[in-house]
Amino acid sequence: MASPTGTVAPTDFGRSGLLRWLVAIVAFPIGGTLGYALGGPAATVPAALISGLITGAVIGLGQALALGLRPQALVLWIAATAVGLGVALAIVTAIIGQIDTSTDAVLLGAVSGLAVGAGQAAVLLRERAGRALVWVGASALAWAIGWFVTTGIGVGLAPGWSVYGLSGAAVSQVITGVVLWKLLAPGEVASSAQA
């Protein structure tokens, strides 16, 4: 939930916030499907950028709604997620080509999580979440594990898919949800506001 000033209200996150965050899992397959359908397979840098931007916008929207962000912070979160995923996917595609192996997917996850996490951490810092920079590493790890889980259970996503499947989304949202729960704990926000 958001406070009247538009910041994340840490006392409201708790269990209900974590549950809302977990419901946002559905944004991953929806975003991936739209990104693939509208941007095409991420086989070229332009297609990767477009697909990543679309996918990231949908994921960012789902997550921002789960956080209960007010309009300005909501827009910033969506933009950070879209740009982070779009740029990361384009960079990885430029370096290694189309993602078609488990190793490529985990690398994409780490780079995407790092880029998305950096942008989202900036929003968390703006919203006075304590130790928001932890979010960058947690996101990189969660996104890499998400891709590992999806490819590890034998899900054969079509080459050029911009984001992992529902199984990977569940794992990454649990990891990041627990980190958010800690970052948005009342003592964490209060201590960062005093700093």
How should these model regions be labeled?
Residues 2-195:
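Juxtamembrane/disordered regions of integral membrane proteins
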